UniProtKB/Swiss-Prot annotation:
Gene Ontology BP terms: mismatch repair
GO molecular function: ATP binding; ATP-dependent DNA damage sensor activity; damaged DNA binding; mismatched DNA binding
Stated name of the protein: DNA mismatch repair protein MutS
Source domain of life: Bacteria
Main function: This protein is involved in the repair of mismatches in DNA. It is possible that it carries out the mismatch recognition step. This protein has a weak ATPase activity.
Classification via Gene3D superfamilies: 1.10.1420.10, 6.10.140.430, DNA repair protein MutS, domain I, MutS, connector domain, P-loop containing nucleotide triphosphate hydrolases
SMART domains: MUTSac (SM00534), MUTSd (SM00533)
InterPro entries: DNA_mismatch_repair_MutS, DNA_mismatch_repair_MutS-lik_N, DNA_mismatch_repair_MutS/MSH, DNA_mismatch_repair_MutS_C, DNA_mismatch_repair_MutS_clamp, DNA_mismatch_repair_MutS_core, DNA_mismatch_repair_MutS_N, DNA_mismatch_repair_MutS_sf
Family note: Belongs to the DNA mismatch repair MutS family.
Sequence positions that bind ATP: 620-627
Keyword tRNA-binding: no
UniProt keywords, alphabetically: ATP-binding, DNA damage, DNA repair, DNA-binding, Nucleotide-binding
Gene, per the UniProt record: mutS
Organism name: Xylella fastidiosa (strain Temecula1 / ATCC 700964)
Amino acid sequence: MREKPEGGKGMAEHTPLMKQYFAAKAEYPDLLLFFRMGDFYELFHQDARKAARLLDITLTQRGSSGGTPIPMAGVPVHAYEGYLARLIALGESVAICEQIGDPGLAKGLVERKVVRIVTPGTITEEALLEERRDTLLMALSRTKNCYGLAWADLAGGRFLVNEVDSEEALEAELARLEPAELLLPDEDAWPEYLQQRNGVRRRPPWLFDADSGRRKLLAFFKLHDLSGFGIENNPQATAAAGALLGYIEETQKQRLPHLTSITMETVGEAITMNAATRRHLELDTRVDGESRHTLLGVLDSTVTPMGGRLLRRWLHRPLRLREVVRQRHAAVGSMIDSDLDNKLRETFRRLGDMERILTRVALRSARPRDISTLRDSLSLLPRLRELLNASDSPRLRVLYAELGEHDSTASLLVKAVAEQPPLKLTDGGVIAPEYDVELDELRKLSNNADQFLIDLETRERESSGISTLKVGYNRVHGYYIEISKGQADKAPVHYTRRQTLTNAERYITEELKAFEDKVLSARDRALAREKLLYEQLLDTVGAQLEPLKRCAAALSELDVLVCFAERAQTLDWVRPELEHTSCLHIEGGRHPVVEAVREQRFEPNDLYLHPERRMLVITGPNMGGKSTYMRQNALIVLLAYIGSYVPASRALIGPIDRIMTRIGAGDDLARGQSTFMLEMTETSYILHHATAQSLVLMDEIGRGTSTYDGLALADAVARHLAHINRCYTLFATHYFELTALAEETYEGGLSGIANVHFDAVEHSERLVFMHTVKDGPANRSFGLQVAALAGLPAATVAQARRRLAELEQRGRESHVSEITQLELDAPQQCNLFASAPSAAQEALVALHPDELTPKQALEALYRLKALL
């Protein structure tokens, strides 16, 4: 909605400044407008009210315009990034309207122009970004059977696309990438979960056209076709990429030289994990929103922020490309064997975030400290190359080459940039001494001013006889001679009064005025010269942007591999063996997170699955370790396929295409967020998508409904997974009846199902969980003991024991199972699987015998007989 001048006045009745403001605001009605006025960014009218509320800053008034007071709020320019970060975190977008040119030289109203739009997905400033998490902007396009995705990490200079063929796959990609801002065509009826996301921005549908997207990409990258990017035959990905690029150009309002290519990701290259699996495995965020005690929290010992971001990306996209993963394993092993990881790690401590610094160089927003950090990082390359040169690891040899030689750029920055430059270019002192003769001369003139002023003060005191006379300077009035009020009558006649204070008078002389003009001119010229030299440095570095980006990417990967080597040695992890044949054999496996946070020794357990043993039915008491066991094996598989060592004594892992989980309601990990419908929805997804190369975790299927319904569901799901999907399945259940599945045959052969259990023992009236997986089914549930441990009142537990004894006795007497007897005693729940009533049954229900005559009753009887 466009903001109109308040008070009902036309534009003609507003001041020139407010006319200028309303003209700028009319172009960006839905954004907050930061309107530069001197040392402040001001917001007016509705923007001011909104900003005052969101930022807790003062709402004031600035005179009036058109006869109406002007609501106003402002933030200082020197601290605006902190306020901007808070607004972006709240989902707001901001248009930055700057003063163009030198306000001091402007005749009349200074020119202003919107130079940039800052949105949640387009931030590049260091102060606004999360150091170890990508900030992504994404666009979506679709046809009936295809979704196109394009996303950009502007701060890191990455541009990627993908296509998926289902809404489930789209949801999985969104869960993996977690875009900060999402662009959707305005006319499409997108799923509800998409529309409710934070950061969704509707765009005109014609911007998502594949042909116009192709033309835009060709023009931007200066190409004749898109085959080099591998997207020539991907119209939906092209459409999304074109819409994304258009939005970036619209918001950034400048060249984007750091976006140099597009990467086409293929779903088949990676192990698929949907949103539920990522949530259940708590890769980097717990289900309660906390980031502590997650897999990433245990795994991440990277030194650099860019390494931390790459590790997070790897963790969310384990690869199916076994040769790529094996090369990572080999690189980690080579580092461990040669102690290379420790040597590299020490060097990495002095590395900066080159990836994001190079983006700011390309966008001309790099600050002096960015350039000095880049200088220091490039100066480390000779040492890093020396360390890597002796390695025989194929991957480390590739990374050695990718680092490149940047001696000339490093040497230039060493000569050109001061050792510890100021934060801002306008503070001066960024360019090192002896780099530029002209700058040195201007600085010398400015620096010699101090001695001149000391000499002048001494001479004037002696010639005037005024002991309190002193020479000073301030930014408003420039240089002055100050004399106290008591001696002001002694001021020489050639002194010209410049300023009157309460206790002193300030004067200027012709000599001091001439000196002031000379010095201030030298300072201004020195700053202008520094700015020119600084821009030249950015040009020089920018010309090497592509090889420098490859260098930063290599450093990031080295940091992650060093992290893997350090974790393997510190946590006693082993190198997994990736097999071509189908198997999942883990000896002495441990849960990486549980082991890291608990004080007691973690009890390791084995897992052995192969084509004739594809499912384990896991029974045992609650708290016995079933859920931990299932998750630890999924995490071990995931770690193996990102290139990490794993928490086990040995691990042989065959091809895996998906990791799928169904965690039941009531689990501590799920925090009671699941419902029976959600349980069935997630189970349905697994049954429809699991393959013979999938790893599936099923935890307590069926407990959200009645006992019979739940048991029937669990039985049917287990059979489907074992015989139809034929996937690797860990099936934890409290239904003891399912243990009989292992004894059945299927199509003349074994069922492929085996029983294992976790046990507990009672010792001194205490229940001790063994946390050790054993072959065979459990023989006790220990439900009442667990209830007592949970703190149920003793009287309640005692009553339960008596009731259990009664049920068991009645079961023995009637030769029916305890579960059947319990069901007979309980109120009956509607059967989920009851068949639909027959026509005869419906007709019978509709009869009202008391209202029928004998003849009508006979006719009804014949009709019923005909329906049978």
